[in-house]
Amino acid sequence: MKIFVANTGRCGSKFMASVFELLTDIPSYHEMAPYCIGETLKDVNNNEVISENTRFAFQQKIAKIKHYSKNGDYFESNNMFIKSFIWPVMAAFEDVYCIYLHRNPMDTFLSHADRGWKFGYDWILQSHWKKNLLKTKNPMLYYENTMWNWFEVRERFFHWENQFTKTYDFDFRNLNNLEEYYKLFEHFGIPYKKIAKLPETERNENVLNKPVTSRYESLMEEINKHWDNPGKEWAFDSDIKDMKAYGVNK
């Protein structure tokens, strides 16, 4: 089975990969290069015919998944699955399982916004792209896009849901709940080991309720200053640049 996680980012997907690695024998990764971000993300979401560079990135992605699979099993929690490389994955594999990992939209928005403009901007869908399910007429600002992404990712999961072998709905608030993982493993038919509790170093502290801080208050003030400005599409580097950094040459 090939298991992927549909999520917006800022949902604990890295932590989930560490739990899979700890409790199962499935090769488990958070984000395996090529990430299929940047120009690859834009190309596959905005054009009917993808470029040679995008095809190459997807070929490398599928090759990596096959190479790192063990007995046909593989797990990756990369949020680009539902945004970008779902098309080649669904074409290449018949046994695709999907976890819908979701966090409430306001916390997701604040977590993205707190990181700031151009920190992960090439991992964000832009609302006016042609293949979006919830497409807007005009481009939006970065902060508007981060909120819109939450709804677009949800719609994309529902759009593909019946084509997955099995799915599982996983609430962010259950990231530290071992019983929830056991239910997930049993639903997917994955052998797993039980432990008394997650190691302290593995616990996701972001699950804990935290008060709104002055940092977030100042962030919202900054966002409000620009909220009504016209949106503008931002540019990306090619995904090929990232692949070269990992020693993959076209």
What are these regions (language model features)?
Residues 12-25, 88-93, 113, 168-192:
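PAPS/PAP-binding and catalytic site of the sulfotransferase fold
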Residues 1, 139-150, 154-169, 173-250:
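PAPS-dependent sulfotransferases, especially Golgi type II membrane carbohydrate sulfotransferases
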